[in-house]
Amino acid sequence: MYRAAASLASKARQAGSSSAARQVGSRLAWSRNYAAKDIKFGVEARALMLRGVEELADAVKVTMGPKGRNVVIEQSFGAPKVTKDGVTVAKSIEFKDRVKNVGASLVKQVANATNDTAGDGTTCATVLTKAIFTEGCKSVAAGMNAMDLRRGISMAVDAVVTNLKGMARMISTSEEIAQVGTISANGEREIGELIAKAMEKVGKEGVITIADGNTLYNELEVVEGMKLDRGYISPYFITNSKAQKCELEDPLILIHDKKVTNMHAVVKVLEMALKKQRPLLIVAEDVESEALGTLIINKLRAGIKVCAVKAPGFGENRKANLQDLAILTGGEVITEELGMNLENVEPHMLGSCKKVTVSKDDTVILDGAGDKKSIEERADQIRSAVENSTSDYDKEKLQERLAKLSGGVAVLKIGGASEAEVGEKKDRVTDALNATKAAVEEGIVPGGGVALLYASKELDKLQTANFDQKIGVQIIQNALKTPVHTIASNAGVEGAVVVGKLLEQGNTDLGYDAAKDEYVDMVKAGIIDPLKVIRTALVDAASVSSLMTTTESIIVEIPKEEAPAPAMGGMGGMDY
């Protein structure tokens, strides 16, 4: 292949600019499978990116606030999806124009990063990204230094985050937790109260999952279980491709404190599971080489439901976690310290549970088959260790183990009249649950976007090194008004008027209640936002926006023109 290519290249050089040279060059490019690139520079590059950012943000921002609208998304299969979830809308958007798509993809990156860190705030992050990047493009076009703008933006964000932390207040009561959940669920009180009840049942550190219900109503079910902070070792173990999870019903559980590398030991355990016609979960330090290959081949070719998960923790903490798991599931830890090895595993050494759900990040074990008395004794041992420990780190790890062992798992079963309704409600419940966890973690600030609005006033005092940095600070100052403006506009009110009224007065708890069309004390009215959500949305939006503002060239692939299908030959004996 390479000799042929070299020969063609030589012919191309000899042919000069002739038609033959062009043909040979074309054949050479084809032989190496090159994809042609298009390069955009400066103002043109940023303008095209901005169009992608604006169109995506405009589709997302209509969902913001209690009077935000739904977005209907066509799907390649099944019924259209109806949602008010910002990150779902953002993920569904692709543009034909490659450069526009670069801008849209970077906004998706902001939404995904905010969603991964805080679990909510994706719409706010998207709206802020558009506002910052729009002003940044104008400033660069006017001759400002892009790097100084970026420094000014960074300084302003740091100052705002410090100000927000000063506003924050911690929450503890069930009523406050319900308020946070209600706001994030677009004002649906029932969802907020359901989340508050779930946290009461399993504790703030407990595990709460969301599932489809079988009725028209939302239900709360608490199941004794444990969550491990490790996911599947290989994606080949996935059984539910839509959810990207491995789900095992009534599995046997092998628990080992060392690496599993021996293929023969794995085959023996697989035979036990096959004989009992049950799935198999392996929890070990690691599963490598032949052993992992054997499991994957049996999963793909023989259809045996199996999954391997790395044991959570390190050192002594890992051993303790495995012992907790063994007691919860009624099994034993296969450990060489007690003279045990995988070759001598017997069926009674394997644990069991009702269901296991494994994602790429974690494993939830529901309704373990362990003895209740043994589980309670183990929990008492951990409580005693917490009381006697003098190390804050050890106490934290012990309390985590106690929550996993005795807290159980709360399952929020979401009901509805149709699959589309259940899907839309699940999106809102997921947002509400994530926001509630964030609020418990870092505290709350007045909601409805007013925390960012009032923080913008403090930027007047910020000192900068030069004029361009000052413009960067002003970009953030203007962007911080956007969430309140958008929420008011979606409620059918003039956003600029609402922003102006709030900035004129001095009460930082006063805000605009879009649901009731009135100005209220946001905290007393229960309209609150988790600090973590607001902080993450601002930091992520500013980071990506300032990167886009300093972009000077974009390289994208030129789409290949597909050759038309060959014409069908005529059939003999037919007249046309």
UniProtKB/Swiss-Prot annotation:
Compartment annotation: Mitochondrion
Gene Ontology biological process terms, A to Z: protein folding; protein refolding
Broad class of the protein's primary localization: mitochondrion
Cellular component GO terms, alphabetical: mitochondrion
Keywords, comma-separated and alphabetical: ATP-binding, Chaperone, Mitochondrion, Nucleotide-binding, Stress response, Transit peptide
Induction: By heat shock.
Residue stretch of the organelle transit peptide: 1-34
InterPro entries according to UniProt: Chaperonin_Cpn60_CS, Cpn60/GroEL, Cpn60/GroEL/TCP-1, GroEL-like_apical_dom_sf, GROEL-like_equatorial_sf, TCP-1-like_intermed_sf
GO molecular function, one term: ATP binding
Functional description taken from the UniProt entry: Implicated in mitochondrial protein import and macromolecular assembly. May facilitate the correct folding of imported proteins. May also prevent misfolding and promote the refolding and proper assembly of unfolded polypeptides generated under stress conditions in the mitochondrial matrix.
Alphabetized HAMAP family for the sequence: CH60
Family of the protein in this entry: Belongs to the chaperonin (HSP60) family.
Protein name: Chaperonin CPN60-2, mitochondrial
Organism: Zea mays
